[in-house]
Amino acid sequence: MRTIDKRIAPNVRLAATLDTGEDVALVLPRGTVLRDGDVLVADDGALVRVAAAHEAVLLVRAPDALTLTRAAYHLGNRHTPVEVGAGCLKLEYDPALADMLTRLGATVERASAPFQPEAGAYGGGHRHGHDATFAEDYALAQQVFDEHHGHSHSHSHSHDHDHDHDHDHQHGPSCSHGHHHGHR
């Protein structure tokens, strides 16, 4: 089996060199995220294993959950790709971010390791509301919300008064309870 040793990223078109020295070009469906250990099938039927390459990263740890959560919040606020681990965060090496995280009380260590950031809440890449895919993204977010809450409702009137009401619904096969939705 041949191997691609490449930074794993959500690219539609990817040029890589296999461990055999062979140059290859990949064309992947939009939103595909290659992960370490994935296996691709070449046009000739050959199998190619994906191996995450080592790169300069920051390993972020904290003395407590609150400090690590604050670090994650500030990284997310900057749209920084982050790999979430048990008790640590991993991100691309960036001295400015290392300084910020240290000032927040985190312990930051520079290392060389594979980096596989989270794909995002709804899969695919990072997009903003002005993109052509906003309607598609918004519909997906609404679908996830409706699946979680088991219902949907809308309000087309002014919100300058209280209109509290209850909905009974289930959150899972064994969880049934009244759930209050107070809207202002």
From Swiss-Prot:
It comes from the Bacteria. Residues 147-184 are annotated as: Disordered. Residues 157-171 have a biased composition (Basic and acidic residues). GO terms for molecular function: nickel cation binding; unfolded protein binding. Keywords: Chaperone, Cytoplasm, Nickel, Nickel insertion. Its main location: cytoplasm. One of its GO terms (biological process) is protein folding. One of its GO terms (cellular component) is cytoplasm. InterPro entries: UreE, UreE_C_dom, UreE_N, UreE_N_sf. Involved in urease metallocenter assembly. Binds nickel. Probably functions as a nickel donor during metallocenter assembly. Belongs to the UreE family. This is Urease accessory protein UreE. The lineage of its organism: Bacteria, Pseudomonadati, Pseudomonadota, Betaproteobacteria, Burkholderiales. The gene is ureE.
